[in-house]
Amino acid sequence: FAQVSVDKPLVSYKGNCGNISSGVGPFAIEKGLVNAEEGTTTVRIYNTNTDKVIAADVTTSNGHVVYDGDFQIAGVPGTASPIRLKFLDPAGTLGKGLLPTGNATDTLEIPGFGPVEVSIVDAANPLVFVKAETLGLTGRELPDELNVDEKKLELLETVRGMAAQKLGLTDDYKKSAWETPGIPKMTFVAKADNYVTSDGKEMKKEDIDLLSRMMSMQKTHPSYAMTGAMCTAAAAVIPGSVVQQVLNPAADTQFIRIGHPGGVLECGVDYEMKENQPVIEDTFGFRTANLLLKGTAVIRK
């Protein structure tokens, strides 16, 4: 997976993308790399960026991918056939385990701001979680609102950069936007509350288990990254983590509902507790994919 910056001459090969991963299974079947089963075809995908395997369950019939369906994803127009993505043994993409610092929470000293409690969690992708209120936010912010607030964007990037430096991804947090723009993903969370989505839909706090906003390449994600949801699900079962602190106590870990700018994303986690710490077996969720184009791109040398 390669992430191309839209405002810098930069391509990052760090981390993975769950939304892009959802298209790999259908492509593999379309190209004959995997034989289609009748009903559901499971495609095991090895992601070289993270050295992890993702199992994609794709609906198939008569040797072909079934794209049409009635499954809808919040923030994505239309409906399609669901693709179940299961991230197997997702912890430790950086080679340092689920908690790469060894702690459920760490305190970062942010220059010009002060101490900030964070949870740095690595499952599917490494994320740095912080409570919205710690940064003067609510968790109800929308991308159009936050992306024009230069001071908040700078603060969020500074926290992310300090986390990146702590992880050894850069030797100076000020260089993180260039040296490691994609990971860790900056994410701020809050307790469930009523809010309005980007398209004006009113969401009730009873329908979600927490509020969350993700940053991607220094801007607010319009909805929620799938790998981010996987890491959020894993973080939800870590005792004392920032995510667990704001999570609805009655939340079902097989059905965690994340309230994001586009609506609600549902995800889950399978795990075992050993010595009061979770061992993550897998995290899972649903995406869709549609065939948009078949063609030839001519690359000039």
Predicted ranges, named:
Residues 1-301:
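Non-transmembrane, aqueous-exposed alpha-helical and coiled segments at domain scale
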